[in-house]
Amino acid sequence: MAEIMADSELAPKFAPFIGMAGIAAAMIFGSAGAAYGTAKSGIGIAGVGTFRPDLIMKCLIPVVMSGIIAVYALVVAVLIAQDLGPPGSGQHYSLFNGFMHLACGLSVGLTGLAAGYCIGIVGDKGVRSFMLQSRIFVGMVLILIFGEVLGLYGLIVALILNTKSKG
């Protein structure tokens, strides 16, 4: 009887809810960052396209980089979801795993939000400046890469945390 009580204290019934909150945090914040980056840089591309339609293909780089942010969040959400199981399946899901998965989701989600914000602003102003001065392109791409790396840092931390939750 004491064994069952100790097990339920370490693995309460609400522990999977916290893990699912990690999935939601990863997808909500990561997708919001990707959407902001896509929308903001898309506005700049639309402005450039009216004056210089020949530059549109080169100016799509910020939009592609914003989409990658959502892929980072999707990868972490799928990894967290693989550790969850339905009640009664005999799978042990502890409170530690729940909080670890919440930390995974928040780390990739919030860094994805920051990266998307960075990519959106740099993409918008960068493509507008590129229309006027072609030498700005290399600098714009470098700044976009540094913005993308913010999301990659969150992905790396989330992957490390996820492996720690497996014991």
Swiss-Prot record:
Subcellular location: Vacuole membrane
Listed transmembrane segments: 14-34, 60-80, 102-122, 141-161
Keywords, comma-separated and alphabetical: Hydrogen ion transport, Ion transport, Membrane, Transmembrane, Transmembrane helix, Transport, Vacuole
Main localization (coarse): membrane
Site (Essential for proton translocation): 148
GO cellular component, one term: vacuolar proton-transporting V-type ATPase, V0 domain
Membrane topology classification: Multi-pass membrane protein
InterPro entries: ATPase_proteolipid_c-like_dom, ATPase_proteolipid_csu, ATPase_proteolipid_su_C_euk, F/V-ATP_Csub_sf
Protein role: Proton-conducting pore forming subunit of the V0 complex of vacuolar(H+)-ATPase (V-ATPase), a multisubunit enzyme composed of a peripheral complex (V1) that hydrolyzes ATP and a membrane integral complex (V0) that translocates protons. V-ATPase is responsible for acidifying and maintaining the pH of intracellular compartments.
UniProt record similarity statement: Belongs to the V-ATPase proteolipid subunit family.
Quaternary structure note: V-ATPase is a heteromultimeric enzyme composed of a peripheral catalytic V1 complex (components A to H) attached to an integral membrane V0 proton pore complex (components: a, c, c', c'', d, e, f and VOA1). The decameric c-ring forms the proton-conducting pore, and is composed of eight proteolipid subunits c, one subunit c' and one subunit c''.
Protein name: V-type proton ATPase subunit c'
Organism per entry: Neurospora crassa (strain ATCC 24698 / 74-OR23-1A / CBS 708.71 / DSM 1257 / FGSC 987)
Gene name linked to the record: vma-11
